[in-house]
C-alpha cells in the first residue's frame, strides 16, 4: 500500500512539474506570437512581406559572429536589470525603480573611474564595479525600508525615485562633473585601467556580458540554495504564513530591495565601464523598464531572463540595420517590443492589483479594529 501511495505522490509531483513547465512555455510563447502577428499586420499594411523581413531580422541578429556579438552586447544591460526586477517580483515586492538604480550606479562607477589614480592598476576596475553596485543597493534600500517599516507604497516611491535619479545625474553631468574637454552633458573619460575588456574586438561586446551571466547564476543559486532565497519566495507566496513560521517579512523586503539595487547598480557600472566610458545624458534609453518586460517574459527564471534579454538584444541590434536594407522603419522593432511590454504590464496588473487590494483591506481592518 505504501508503495502505491508513493507512486501516486511521485506521479502527482511529475504532473505538477510538467504543468508548471507548460505554463512557463505558454507564458513565453503567447506574447511573442501576438507581437510578431501585430508586426506582420503592420508590414502587410505598408506592402512588405513579413516572412522576408523577419528572415532579414534573424540574419542581422545572428547571421555571423560579428552580428551575434552585437546582439549579446545589446542584451548585456538587460541581464542586470531583469535580474534586479525578478528578485523583487519573486518576493511579492513591486519594484519599478531599477532604472534609477542603474543610472546612479553607472555614474558612481564612472566617477571613480576618472577620479581615482590610474596607478591603482588592476584594482581600479573592481573598485569601480563594486562602488556602482553599492550605490545602487543604497538607492533601493531606502524605499525598501520605507515599505517595510511604514508601508509606503513601493510602486509610487520607486517610480518617483527614477525621476529623482534622472534629475541628480543630469545636474551632476551638466555641472560639477562636466568635462572641460568635451561638449555639454558628458563627464571626463574613465582611465583605461577602469575599462572592461572587449571580448570580440572590434565589436562592442565586453566582459560585462560575462558579469551579467554570473549575476544570473548568483540569482539562481540564491533562489534555490540559500535560506534567505527560500524565505523571499515564501514572503512572495504568502506573507501571513511567512510570519507564522518565523520569517522576518520586513527584513526580507529590505534585503530583496537592496539586492535589486545591487544588481541594477552593477549593471549601470558595467554599461559605463564597458560600453560608454563616460556618463552623459541618455546614458540609459530605458534599460530598467525594458528589464521589467524581460523579467516578466521569462517568468523571473534565470533561463527565461537570458532568453528574454537575448531576444530584446536581437531586436535592438537588427532594428538598427534592417532600415538600411529595406523600406521598413525602425518603428517595427518598437511595435514588437511595445506589444511584449503590454503583455508585461497586464502580467504586473494581474499580480499587483489583487495584492494591493489585500493590503488596503488589511489597512481598513486595522483602522476599524
Can you name each region flagged by the protein language model?
Residues 1-34, 40-44, 237, 244-251, ...:
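Cytosolic-side transmembrane-helix boundaries in multi-pass membrane proteins
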Residues 28-44, 81-85, 106, 110-112, ...:
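Hydrophobic core segments of alpha-helical transmembrane domains in multi-pass membrane transport
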Residues 41-48, 56, 61-116, 129, ...:
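Single transmembrane alpha-helix segments in multi-pass membrane proteins
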